[in-house]
C-alpha cells in the first residue's frame, strides 16, 4: 500500500521510544525544570471539559502563542499529601516524551502548575474518538464504509507496530483511546492515546501481572481473563481485533458484564462466556498452554458453542477481512497475528486501499461536545 509504506518501514528501527531494540526497561529521567513550572492558564485558554477518568480530566483549550490552535489539556487529580508526581503521570510522560509516530498522540508540553500544584499534559487536539464515531453510526442505523474501516484499522496497527517495535505494550486499547484528527492537515489521521497503563516489556519477557488488571473488560484477551502472569504484545492485538469487529457492526463483539472492578482477582465468567459464545470453547489442541493458566479449569463447567464469528460480524468466511479478524482474536496468544504481519495482510492490498485520511468528505460526525453538553469551566 503505497500511501503508508514509508511509515511502516521506519517502525522497526526504534527512533528513541520504548528503550530501543535492546529491551531496556528505563527511560531518561523526568526533570520538571522551571520552564515547566508556569501557570497553565497563562499559556492556554481553557474552553470546556471533554473527558474524564480515574486520572483526572481533559479540557479543550487554545494555545495563546499560536492563535486558533486547539490543544487538549490533561489535568491529573491531586495525589495524597507528600506523594508528589503520580506514578501513572510519570510513566505517561516518560513514554510519550520519547515516542514519535504519526499514529501516536504527540505530547506538546508539560506544566506543573504552581497555583494548584497539579500536573498538566498538553497534546494536539483531536476532534473525534472511535467511541463517539461508532456511537454516531449505531444511533443513526448507518455503517462505516469499507474504506474507512480499513484506513482506521491500518493506522491503529501502524501505531501499535511502532510501539511493539520499541518494546512498549499499550495495555488499554479501546475505542475511546483511539483518537482521530478533525479538519486540518492531519484530517482523518488516527492517534493512539492514553498511555497511563502502557509498559515497557523486555526480552525474555518478565511477569507483568504485578501491575494489576489491565484492558477494559470488553477488549481483554482470554489469557488475561484466565489469569496469565506472562502476557505479551498479543493482548494489544486481541483488543484491536475487538475494535475491528466493532467498526464492522457498530456493536461491541464481547460485551460482558463486569464483576466488581475493584477486586482484580475476581474471575470474569460472563466475559469469558461471551467470548465462548462467539469463538467456541478453547481446547488443548487449539491452545496447548491453556492448561498452565490459573483459571483454565473453570472452563470445564461452561457450555460449549460452535464458532459463530462470521455470523456475529456479518462477513463472508472466505473474505480477507474475516481471515485477518480471525487471526487477531485467536485464543492462543502465541499464534495470534503480530502487528507487523497484520500490516502485510492481503486485506490491506485489495481495493479499496487504506488511506492516510480515513474520513469521507464532508466529515459527517458532529464536533466533540462538553461533558453533559454543558460548558464545564476550568475553575469549576
Swiss-Prot record:
Protein name, as recorded: Probable cyclin-dependent kinase 8
Keyword Transcription among UniProt keywords: yes
Binding site for ATP: 50-58, 74
GO CC, one annotated term: nucleus
GO biological process terms held by the UniProt record: aggregation involved in sorocarp development; G1/S transition of mitotic cell cycle; positive regulation of gene expression; protein phosphorylation; protein stabilization; regulation of aggregation involved in sorocarp development; sorocarp spore cell differentiation
Stretches assigned to the Protein kinase domain: 44-348
Region (Disordered): 1-22
Chain intervals with Low complexity compositional bias: 1-10
Summary of subunit composition and partner proteins: Component of the Mediator complex.
Protein localization: Nucleus
EC number: 2.7.11.22, 2.7.11.23
Gene from which the chain derives: cdk8
